[in-house]
Design a protein with these regions (language model features):
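Condensing-enzyme catalytic core mediating Claisen C-C bond formation in acyl metabolism
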Residues: 89-170, 174, 178, 270-305
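Claisen-condensing/thiolase-fold acyl-transfer catalytic domains that form or cleave C-C bonds
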Residues: 20-22, 34, 39-41, 47-66, ...
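Phosphate/pyrophosphate-binding loops at sites that engage ATP/ADP/AMP, CoA/4′-phosphopantetheine
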Residues: 1-12, 178-193, 244-245
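Short beta-strand-loop/turn "lid" adjacent to the catalytic site in phosphate-handling enzymes
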Residues: 10-22
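Flexible, glycine-rich active-site loops centered on histidine and acidic residues
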Residues: 66-100
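Short, high-confidence coil segments that cap the C-terminus of an alpha-helix
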Residues: 11, 70-71, 194, 250
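Short beta-strand segments
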Residues: 17, 48, 73-79, 105, ...
Length: 305
């Protein structure tokens, strides 16, 4: 906000996309609203989605602005995927990374391309899942210390999610290439005219397979962002954008994301005049409470002290 000279009172809508909130309730958007000191007339809400989450956030923010309900929106997206993964699990620990992003969208009088194609196949809801900890299967004494090893010796616990890798790969190869073709056609573009294809960085092999099957220009579809920053889930596609050179020509950009749900989304957007803040390392605030201090804080809260 400081880099774009935005005041807290300027924000009209706050959307927060994540899957691993600070607390089961309240939503992180309300917490962020208070931390940022936004005005009380600024509605704030969470969206619980993973790898397709950034595109879903853009879609809803764009729809709210296009409808005239608000003239701008601050879209926050972030998850701690690596922190939530058992680091001894070689199947998962080497895949995920932590990241957060902030995107400010506002209405302009100038016509700009902003086309979306969204979808969901709920029959695959259990292909990527964190089965414990919700109201259907709350943690209890039997599950909190649960530890299971798969055939490869990877340890899985109730505190982490799981994925049916082969099923998710097949889903990706079925959905992503056709999704790219559909969004290009919906925007009225030609694939060779697109400046950047920001494809969800599930892993390098998957991105390369999607590029090949979709027959899009490989030089315009980065695959090395996964190698640099891992799979950032909700932030994966925007990491591709932020990793571009400051002077990159990104007038015609396509975001293509797919994952948990099973869900997917793509957007074709004109990013002329975009301010790209790049990528930086997160530095935690020095006054943040550690785990022991937080526990003590809530004990006092329960006691009414």
């Amino acid at each position: 906000m400081s880099e774009m000279s935005l005041a807290a009172g300027d924000i009209e809508l706050l959307i927060f996309v994540n899957q691993k909130p600070d607390f089961p309730e309240p939503c992180d958007a309300c917490i962020a609203h208070g931390e940022l000191g936004l005005r009380k007339s600024c509605p704030s809400l969470d969206i619980n989605l993973g790898c397709s989450g950034y595109v879903h956030g853009l879609w809803i923010a764009h729809a709210m602005i296009a409808s005239g309900a608000v003239s701008n929106c601050l879209l926050l997206v972030g998850d701690l995927c690596a922190r939530a993964t058992d680091q001894t699990n070689r199947k998962a620990a080497q895949v995920f990374g932590d990241a957060a992003s902030a995107t400010f969208l506002k209405r302009t009088e100038e016509e700009r391309t902003a086309t979306f194609v969204m979808g969901c196949d709920g029959s695959g809801w259990d292909k990527i899942i964190h089965p414990f900890g919700g109201m259907r299967l709350p943690y209890d004494a039997a599950s909190i210390d649960l530890s299971v090893e798969d055939a490869a010796g990877n340890r899985w616990t109730a505190q982490q999610g799981m994925m049916k890798g082969e099923d998710v790969f097949n889903f990706t190869m079925e959905v992503a290439p056709s999704l790219l073709a559909e969004i290009i056609a919906a925007a009225g573009w030609k694939k060779e005219d697109v400046d950047l294809f920001a494809i969800h960085q599930a892993n390098k092999q998957i991105v390369e397979n999607v590029i090949e099957k979709a027959e899009i220009p490989a030089e315009k579809a980065p695959t090395d962002v996964f190698s640099k920053y891992a799979n950032n889930s909700t932030n994966s596609v925007v990491m591709v954008l932020c990793d571009q050179p400051e002077n990159a020509e990104l007038k015609k950009t396509i975001f293509c994301a797919f994952g948990i749900g099973l869900s997917w989304g793509a957007t074709a957007v004109d990013l002329t005049g975009l301010y790209n803040g790049g990528i930086s390392t997160y530095v935690p605030p020095v006054n943040r409470m550690n785990r022991e201090q937080q526990i003590e804080h809530w004990i006092k809260h329960f006691k009414g002290e």
